[in-house]
From Swiss-Prot:
Binds 2 Zn(2+) ions per subunit. NAD(+) binds at residues 177, 197, 202, 264-266, 288-289. The lineage of its organism: Bacteria, Pseudomonadati, Pseudomonadota, Gammaproteobacteria, Vibrionales. It is an enzyme of class 1 (oxidoreductase). The record marks 150 as: Important for catalytic activity for the proton relay mechanism but does not participate directly in the coordination of zinc atom. This is L-threonine 3-dehydrogenase. Its EC number is 1.1.1.103. One of its GO terms (cellular component) is cytoplasm. It comes from Vibrio cholerae serotype O1 (strain ATCC 39315 / El Tor Inaba N16961). Its main location: cytoplasm. SUPFAM superfamilies: GroES-like (SSF50129), NAD(P)-binding Rossmann-fold domains (SSF51735). The active site is at 42 (charge relay system), 45 (charge relay system). One of its GO terms (biological process) is L-threonine catabolic process to glycine.
Amino acid sequence: MKIKALSKLKPEQGIWMNEVDMPELGHNDLLIKIKKTAICGTDVHIYNWDEWSQKTIPVPMVVGHEYVGEVVGIGQEVRGFQIGDRVSGEGHITCGHCRNCRGGRTHLCRNTIGVGVNRTGCFSEYLVIPAFNAFKIPDGISDDLASIFDPFGNAVHTALSFDLVGEDVLITGAGPIGIMAAAVAKHVGARHVVITDVNEYRLDLARKMGVTRAVNVAEQNLEDVMKELGMTEGFDVGLEMSGVPSAFSAMLKTMNHGGRIALLGIPPSSMAIDWNQVIFKGLVIKGIYGREMFETWYKMASLIQSGLDISPIITHHFKVDDFQKGFDIMRSGASGKVILDWQ
């Protein structure tokens, strides 16, 4: 049986709709009928066929890793799932054998394989993944929100790396993950949450999500904003989401002594760091990759169930046949999360 999919078919710019074989269900797998998928910044990198994509992505391959769907097939060894369960899933498939996997630190597996990056993705009518990677979506959480649990998890993992209650938080990079991290920080009790970017559309989106201040650093000085807020000592927690060297440099300068920084954005390997800021301020810097399995997933569901509203981050919906419009709007920068409807 052939099914519809969105694939990287050629080593050049673009994503194409094609037909692929129905995936085969293994003993430990679930077969998921896809309802909705969301376009990730990673998918845009793959579309653009940048240097990272050229080194990483096998061609041809079905792409995508943000989704919600319904369980329609269950491998014979699988327990804990039923036909009809609504699921999303962890996009990092881990080995189960390395020291970190065996120690319960699965998100630090050294042999991680990415859905839609190293193996067949979810931009397809059906997806097969290990049942271990599936997460049942609680009733009361919409399909739209469930489809963005993967990037929401990046935001939650990063934001909750440190205690935020009563703290002043700086977030550099107002992409969807940065904005969701800001909403999480406010929800769990941070005092001032300041987010910086140069994209006015996304700064407006951050304002709608409740940040204290959204600062266009091309037009406004971060130190001036801190004075206006009555901040005399610097930020307690920094969440770096942009990968932009100048943003990280500004963060280091404005951190309080003893401040803590979580890094999710991927800067160029040649990025220079003012180590005086790190050493003499006693800063703690932590790298973040993916989501904790599955603690972050339970926290995501609980945050939404306790009243966190991240729905404004979803700005566009398209039928899957109009996927090109979705990629165009994502590439323009004038969007939050873009959802493709497969049904």
